[in-house]
């Protein structure tokens, strides 16, 4: 647990920023949030450009945070920050406002994740678009 912010709050913030930055698919948001919240794998991913290594890192992720991530997304949807329609997530005006106010640097974990997010997104976009859809089958 991080200073003043727990893992569910971090997951909610990370997922909201991913949606804000163009990730719409539920599977992709869940997969990238899971990847970003695992510090060791995030650092490994940042240090490589080998596509096979990228696939290996993603394949080795455990699902320990998936319940937390899904709970966070449900709370964000129920709280009016996000909407979920036809398998895609989108931010409401309240969610956009929340993302713009995520400047509080008291959470080192969240700061590090948000700092690494653009590079991770760029590396994973180069891979197959459906890599998380194959890894995380989410039945609704």
What kind of region is each of these model predictions?
Residues 103-140:
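Exposed, interaction-prone assembly regions rather than primary DNA-binding/catalytic cores
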Residues 1-61:
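Short, amphipathic alpha-helical interface elements at domain boundaries
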Residues 74-88:
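A short, conserved structural fragment
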Residues 85-108:
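Accessory beta->alpha helical hairpin/"wing" motif in late/C-terminal subdomains of nucleic-acid enzymes
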Residues 51-57, 72, 115-117:
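Short alpha-helical linear motifs
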Residues 59, 63-67, 85, 89:
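Short, well-ordered coil↔helix boundary/capping segments
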Residues 62-78:
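Short amphipathic alpha-helical interaction segments
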